[in-house]
């Protein structure tokens, strides 16, 4: 431990915590949780279409409006400048209030890369706004508050909080932004340690309000659910989601159904979840087709 403390950890790849989490579980527990490390390339395949591309497309529309106003600016502070600046501030407010939820966040790799994506988009918009003649803002509005998580395993939930903070600080350091010092690290209570499907007192668990959902939910086949999760839990789960998720469906389908229901209700813009090929057949197919 003393030797490790003497090393420079400032450039650590935070995705390593996913490996630490997976290896920290005994094989039986890992099987029960369906817990497996998701590599950054796979995560980006979801982050791109769910978060990055839609936000960049929206920013391009805002930038075009700013550019049209910028062409009319005769001096800094005139009505055209103020209108252009107001558009940019409104855009920043949208980024500040944006929320990405991983309702099975494990050690936080999806949260880290979602946060990085948001910060990259904001940084890009700051640079373009400056090119169009607007003054640079003092600081960024995106940060750890933008990513929400739910994780049943207490160890993994704490790793997720550490992962997000390290990712935030590394990004700021790499892009020339100072660290906040008061406090140095806020608590990340919005990365919750609880069940994402069933509420503690019974019934369906609520998910926090978010713009998008991304993640790699646990997968566990129908025949293994009772053996791994217990009769009582499996019975309650299937009863709670009766009529929405067939009794023979894989555990991962419950996350798909909840995301689908929120999109249908207008409470969620998009969702991107990892699943195995088995989701395309049998009882699972009914959830996908819903």
Give short role names for the model-derived ranges:
Residues 1-26:
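Long recognition/docking surfaces used for binding and targeting
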Residues 29-289:
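SAM-dependent methyltransferase catalytic region
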């Amino acid at each position: 431990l003393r030797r490790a403390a003497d090393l420079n950890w400032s450039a650590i790849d935070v995705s390593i915590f996913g490996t630490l989490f997976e290896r920290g579980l005994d094989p039986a527990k890992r099987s029960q949780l369906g817990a497996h490390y998701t590599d950054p390339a796979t995560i980006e395949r979801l982050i791109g279409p769910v978060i990055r591309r839609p936000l960049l497309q929206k920013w391009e529309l805002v930038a075009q409006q700013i550019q049209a106003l910028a062409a009319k600016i005769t001096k800094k502070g005139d009505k055209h400048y103020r209108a252009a600046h107001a558009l940019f501030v409104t855009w920043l407010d949208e980024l500040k209030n944006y929320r990405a939820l991983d309702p099975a966040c494990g050690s936080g790799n999806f949260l880290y890369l979602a946060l990085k994506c948001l910060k990259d988009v904001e940084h890009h918009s700051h640079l373009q706004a400056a090119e169009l003649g607007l003054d640079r803002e003092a600081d960024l509005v995106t940060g750890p508050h933008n990513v929400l998580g739910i994780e049943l395993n207490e160890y993994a939930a704490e790793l997720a909080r550490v992962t997000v903070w390290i990712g935030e600080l590394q990004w700021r350091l790499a892009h020339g932004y100072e660290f906040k010092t008061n406090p140095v690290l806020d608590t990340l209570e919005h990365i919750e340690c609880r069940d994402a499907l069933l509420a503690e007192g019974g019934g369906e668990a609520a998910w926090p309000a978010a713009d998008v959902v991304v993640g790699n939910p646990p997968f566990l086949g129908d025949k293994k659910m009772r053996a791994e999760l217990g009769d009582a839990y499996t019975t309650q789960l299937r009863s709670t989601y009766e009529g929405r998720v067939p009794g023979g469906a894989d555990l991962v389908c419950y996350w798909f159904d909840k995301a689908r229901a929120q999109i249908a209700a207008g409470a969620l813009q998009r969702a991107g979840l990892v699943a195995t090929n088995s989701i395309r057949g049998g009882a699972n197919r009914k959830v996908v087709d819903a």
